[in-house]
Structures are given as C-alpha cells and as structure tokens.
Amino acid sequence: MGKYTLPEMPYAYDALEPHIDAKTMEIHHTKHHQAYTDKLNAALEKCPAEIQEKDILDILSDISSVPEDKRSAINFNGGGYDNHRLFWNNMKANGGGEPGGSIADAIKDSFGSFSDFKEKFSSTTAVIQGSGWGWLVYNPRSEERRVGKECRSRWSPYH
C-alpha cells in the first residue's frame, strides 16, 4: 500500500452545481485523482526511503532531490495529486464572489482591483491548451503575488 490515499471530498459531488455538475466532480475525484494517487505511490516505491518519507509538497519543492529517472513521473503525478487536493479544498458550495479580508487587500495591492485580477487571471490562463492549471501564487520570500499558469498539464505550482 502506498503512502498517499485518495482524500475524501469535503462536500457532496453535486455541491458546486450549476457551475460544475456532479458527474464531472465524481469522475475527477474517483477516476482522475485516484489515478494520480496510484501512479504517485508506484513512482515513490522506486525511490530511496528518504524521498518516500517526505511530504509531497517538500518533494515537489525540491524535485531535483528525486532520482532523475523518477522525476518526471513524480512531478506529473504528484502535481496532479496535489492540484486536485488544492482544488477540492478551495471550492465550496455557494462560494465565489469577491473576497474580503487580507486576501482582498493583497489582490488590490498586487493587481489594482479584484476586477483587474480576474482579467489578468483570465487572460493568462486562457492560453493553456488542453488540460492545465492556473494559480494565484504568493512568494513569501519576495512577497510577490502573481498569476501563474502551468502549461505542462498537472505539474505543481510549488516550483
């Protein structure tokens, strides 16, 4: 048995309707996310124990520490595993709309307004062909906030 398991959904598959239908959520959870979980575990089994013992975020943040012949599989499947986990945990029923609090302040400071952020996010991620992810990312070292896109499909926003 591998280290990672398919996380339980924090809400029902139909909770995001009408924006995302229940069947799409179920397929992404039980098929896609499960496949990333299984393939990540299979790739990690072939790595040294010190890699296997790390958290996926630590592995993805230091992907060069992974044996070269395993990097691509771990980067791809670890990214797919964690991107889905982030997605499930950042969506909620009756969510959406303009944020408040510190995230709203940070968006305003970095992009001018929430409307400007949405425009930047949309224009940056619209060029992703096929599968891919777009993220609002924050670098605590430089305090930079930016919209990141990952065109290499499900790889990680952590590197």
Task: For every predicted segment, state its role.
Residues G148-H159:
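Positively charged, low-complexity/disordered segments
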